[in-house]
Amino acid sequence: MRLDRFLANLPELSRRDAQMLIAGGHLRVDGQVVRDGTHEVRVFSRVELDERLLQAGKPARYYMLHKPMGCVSATRDPQHPTVLDLFPEDLRDDLHIGGRLDYNTTGLMLLTNDGQWSRRLTLPGSRRDKVYYVETEAPIDQRYVDAFAAGLHFRFEDLVTLPAQLEPIGPRCARLTLHEGRYHQVKRMFGHFDNKVLRLHRERMGDICLDPQLPPGAWRPLNAEEICSV
């Protein structure tokens, strides 16, 4: 919400009053004097009118989780444990997932209460790299590398996937870099060759890498550099 609209919502202030207070330098947002009425006020913003606190602002929270197998990427599920069940109950409030993983896919998952941040993370236009370690039933050869780089046609959506980079690191394992997120995309890409994915593990999203010190099921807060990378 714009700062001038935020102030105009106060019952004792008119829109004209709000404009004059802003122009006079009476407003501080997160400790900084703001004279621009279009300045954005978020639920996380601390807003002060002179010495009066108008909004304390709730803390923005950002977490990295090493998702284990056997839990769903959801906030609630009637049948299965969810990734939120891995957090203490007092931390679960308002958390949502930025970039889901399938039930038996493991690896990096990001959770936050900051909707704008998670939208930047997952917007299709962001082309943010996602890196996966993949193990398959049948051997992986150069045909896969070439086809993934050219893009594969997905009949259901009638689209061609963006070029992806596949790096074989063993007869039946590879590292795959995607620049988009489609439904079951990795499994469908290997399915183009009738090759079943046996293990799928996400290692990185954008510039955020899974912390090697985190065992499956463990989590930690993101540091400032990781938060600002999105």
Curated annotation (Swiss-Prot):
The reaction(s) this protein catalyses: uridine(516) in 16S rRNA = pseudouridine(516) in 16S rRNA
Pfam family, one: PseudoU_synth_2
GO terms of molecular function: 16S rRNA pseudouridine(516) synthase activity; pseudouridine synthase activity; RNA binding
GO biological process: enzyme-directed rRNA pseudouridine synthesis
Active site: residue positions: D102
EC number: 5.4.99.19
One GO CC term on file: cytosol
Gene3D superfamilies xrefs: Alpha-L RNA-binding motif, Pseudouridine synthase I, catalytic domain, N-terminal subdomain, RNA-binding S4 domain
Top-level taxon of the source organism: Bacteria
Residue stretches in coiled coil: none
Keywords tagged on the record: Isomerase, RNA-binding, rRNA processing
Residues in S4 RNA-binding domain copies: 1-68
Cross-referenced PANTHER family: PSEUDOURIDINE SYNTHASE, PSEUDOURIDINE SYNTHASE FAMILY PROTEIN-RELATED
Function text: Responsible for synthesis of pseudouridine from uracil-516 in 16S ribosomal RNA.
Family label: Belongs to the pseudouridine synthase RsuA family.
Protein name, per record: Ribosomal small subunit pseudouridine synthase A
Organism for this UniProt entry: Pseudomonas aeruginosa (strain ATCC 15692 / DSM 22644 / CIP 104116 / JCM 14847 / LMG 12228 / 1C / PRS 101 / PAO1)
Lineage: Bacteria, Pseudomonadati, Pseudomonadota, Gammaproteobacteria, Pseudomonadales
